[in-house]
Amino acid sequence: MNKLYCAGTFCFDFLDSNYREMAKKDYRSLVLGDSALLLQKSDYVLLNKKLKYIGPFYFESEGMVDELIVSSEVGMIRECTHAVFLLDEGCCPGTIAELILASELKKNVQIFYIRRGDSEETESKLHTPCWFPIIMSQQINHNNTKVVECKNYEEAIDNILSYVRSL
């Protein structure tokens, strides 16, 4: 059974009054098919007969305790067989740490990133502020890291959903 971990910045905060509505736009809600599944703590969600979504979930610890969130997500990354990363506007430090951990553990890593224009982020041919962790992941885990350039968030989501369906 494949086990999927989907990393990236959550596009909402539970302190916002409309966080439940905003959660519906998070790519993990689309992978799960229902934002309610993302907002509840669970060991996993069965996506099909060959694939479990094992995390992250938005509420992973009682009271949102930071140390418990980190240890929980590290455990999920250790357990997963496939790790998806959506890198868009800028990398959250937690997402970068998750990417490097998954790479060090030689997981099947799929990175979907939003490419900026040719005149932006010219330090790398990737044209993204996330170029350094992407290249580091490729160097650490070259046999198991795939990088997919996307024009925008919608294309990234389409590519992620296609990838998940292929598992």
Task: Walk through the language-model features, giving the residues of each.
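Conserved catalytic or regulatory cores that recognize and/or transform ribose-phosphate-containing ligands
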Residues: 1-167
